[in-house]
């Protein structure tokens, strides 16, 4: 049902972007369970997601389940899921190129003169700026999509004279 609700929300309101966390290879996960996960991801379409392999923790009930998923199967499933999620994330980023969004400036970026922040869709956005902007919201035009981030350009600073 979540898949239907999630995809319907995105159809009705284009400003909604879905994000999720996925664990593959949980104790007892079958091929069918994993196929249903992929079907859900295809149905919803995620703007961003985190995905991991399950690792048993001593002392937890799941660690004692007899049907543990072999490590190589977990790795294959994670690779398949991440390929799908990465393609969806890049497609979402590509679709937002050219949009003007408010970006919350979080920190100094990885390159000289660069700042880094987050769009309302939680996309990482890198742009030319300065440290005084940390903590501020600045309007940015999203100019180039990358797999895990966007490049942007400040178009004006709110409240500037």
Which role fits each region the language model picked out?
Residues 1-6, 10-11:
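Single conserved hydrophobic/aromatic residue that forms the stacking wall/gate
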Residues 64-161:
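Terminal RNA-binding accessory module
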Residues 29-47, 71-76, 105-108:
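Short, electropositive alpha-helical surface patch
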Residues 14-33, 52-70:
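Conserved strand-turn element in the central/C-terminal portion of the radical SAM core barrel
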Residues 12-16, 43-46:
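Secondary-structure transition/capping motifs at alpha-helix termini
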Residues 1, 17-19, 23, 102, ...:
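Residues at or immediately flanking beta-strands
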Residues 7, 21-23, 38-42, 50, ...:
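Generic hydrophobic alpha-helical scaffold/packing signal
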Residues 45, 53, 144:
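Conserved functional loop/turn residues at catalytic and ligand-binding sites
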């Amino acid at each position: 049902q979540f898949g239907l609700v999630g995809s319907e929300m995105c159809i009705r309101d284009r400003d909604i972007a879905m994000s999720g966390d996925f664990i593959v290879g949980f104790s007892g996960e079958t091929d069918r369970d994993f196929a249903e996960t992929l079907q859900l991801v295809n149905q919803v379409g995620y703007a961003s997601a985190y995905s991991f392999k399950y690792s048993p923790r001593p002392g937890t009930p799941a660690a004692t389940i007899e049907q543990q998923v072999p490590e190589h199967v977990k790795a294959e499933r994670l690779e398949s899921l991440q390929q799908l999620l990465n393609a969806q994330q890049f497609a979402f980023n590509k679709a937002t190129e050219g949009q003007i969004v408010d970006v919350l400036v979080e920190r100094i970026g990885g390159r000289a003169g660069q700042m880094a922040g987050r769009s309302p869709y939680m996309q990482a956005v890198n742009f030319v700026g300065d440290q005084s902007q940390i903590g501020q919201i600045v309007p940015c035009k999203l100019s180039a999509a990358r797999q895990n981030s966007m490049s942007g350009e400040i178009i004006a600073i709110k409240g500037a004279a």
